[in-house]
Amino acid sequence: MIEFDNLTYLHGKPQGTGLLKANPEDFVVVEDLGFEPDGEGEHILVRILKNGCNTRFVADALAKFLKIHAREVSFAGQKDKHAVTEQWLCARVPGKEMPDLSAFQLEGCQVLEYARHKRKLRLGALKGNAFTLVLREVSNRDDVEQRLIDICVKGVPNYFGAQRFGIGGSNLQGALRWAQTNTPVRDRNKRSFWLSAARSALFNQIVAERLKKADVNQVVDGDALQLAGRGSWFVATTEELAELQRRVNDKELMITAALPGSGEWGTQREALAFEQAAVAAETELQALLVREKVEAARRAMLLYPQQLSWNWWDDVTVEIRFWLPAGSFATSVVRELINTTGDYAHIAE
């Protein structure tokens, strides 16, 4: 298995170094649900601004304030503790009376707005996130500048970030131990983290091998192609390669890579043979995913940051803004820009 730090770069290994998250204000995340509260219903959507506290901690504090069980407060995704983040929480509070959430007080947390909503906010039910990052102590400004320009055109590898694998790769190591011993894992959180790490590592490996090819975005026979921004996909055939290549070049279609698991991976012929060869040595992790009935899926191979802009405060400090769809990692963008000091694993997804 390729170590995360050794995964293939799309734009070559960065020449410069820099510091990511010198302080929480250097990593700002604003959650984009893609919809507005209904204005009625038994749930309350609460938009919060937090700094220095994790999502679960705030959710538990909100439940205590509302005098409801912690399981009645949900969220679309975890946000980093060591960052300034805006996100929505959802509390189930039936009844016509609206509680005064302006009275909710928690150090490092502020209620920005709240409104009634008809449905529970479920994990993953967001459109994406807007990021504002500040990179400090940047060396080789010219290299970083050129990479930003290139990323606007060619994107970055859609790798799962190091945080998916846990501090020191602990989640992936747990998955490997589980696969090797076949000992039942009772803890539901561990099961989820370990299976996710296993599948993510296999995806990263497939993408890393594909990036070694001369023309990364060249459609091959049997590729599974996805409409940009959609989850559905279809298989490329030799008769239509030229037209499909044009649509890929126009970013209308995206080449996908496998999220291995049980069932068919989705690719066929040449593309399927390539993917199978890329992870052929990882038989234990593949067997674990099949045994635990984790269904195979597809994920875009490349990621195109939207609304990408940047501003150099001085020769060694740059502010970068961009928007990413749900499930994508800001650290996978930063990885193509600079060699960062520190460990990504503490940064929440």
From Swiss-Prot:
PROSITE patterns, sorted: TRUD (PS50984), UPF0024 (PS01268)
Amino-acid positions noted as binding substrate in the UniProt annotation, renumbered to this chain: 27, 129, 329
Superkingdom per UniProt: Bacteria
Residue ranges of every copy of the TRUD domain listed in the record: 155-303
Enzyme class at the top of the EC tree: isomerase
Catalytic residue list: 80
GO function terms (MF aspect): RNA binding; tRNA pseudouridine(13) synthase activity
Entry GO terms, CC: cytosol
GO biological process: tRNA pseudouridine synthesis
Function of the molecule: Responsible for synthesis of pseudouridine from uracil-13 in transfer RNAs.
Family note: Belongs to the pseudouridine synthase TruD family.
Name of this protein: tRNA pseudouridine synthase D
Species annotation: Shigella dysenteriae serotype 1 (strain Sd197)
Gene: truD
